Amino acid sequence: MAVKIKLKRLGKIRSPHYRIVVADSRTRRDGRAIEEIGKYHPTYNPSVMEVDAERVAYWLGVGAQPTEPVLAILKKTGDWQKFKGEPAPAPLLQPAEKAARPSFEAIGGEDEGKGEAITQKKKADKKDEAAAESSASEA
């Protein structure tokens, strides 16, 4: 049985996500896979490439052939060079850690509570008018 390491497409239209899978070469692109050995998310910045190096080494060792897109991913992660016995490539770009947003208190803001309302509330106006009318009728 001819085995290939290929990309299985997931996601929505214009939002692709791929799984790196080992499958029979005669199966459909998104068909049944023997094993899932990684992920590839090209729309993220930088794109995410997660590969299980042990399983890739095993499948390459037993004769699985990577497709061209998977071969490019394996070269970027260094798994292909490790299999061929070549020197490893430069490390991949890692996403920058997002700094926590400074809190309001850390900036120096002081919580003064609620200020006075610019407009009066309707219920309060009605009570004030009713009280004024009753005091006017008493006098």
From Swiss-Prot:
Region described as Disordered: spans on this chain: 84-139
Coiled coil listed as a keyword: no
Domain of life: Bacteria
One GO CC term, this protein: cytoplasm
InterPro entries for this protein: Ribosomal_bS16, Ribosomal_bS16_CS, Ribosomal_bS16_dom_sf
GO terms for biological process, alphabetical: translation
Molecular-function annotations in GO: structural constituent of ribosome
Alphabetized UniProt keyword annotations: Ribonucleoprotein, Ribosomal protein
Similarity-based family: Belongs to the bacterial ribosomal protein bS16 family.
HAMAP family documented for this protein: Ribosomal_bS16
Protein name: Small ribosomal subunit protein bS16
Gene (name only): rpsP
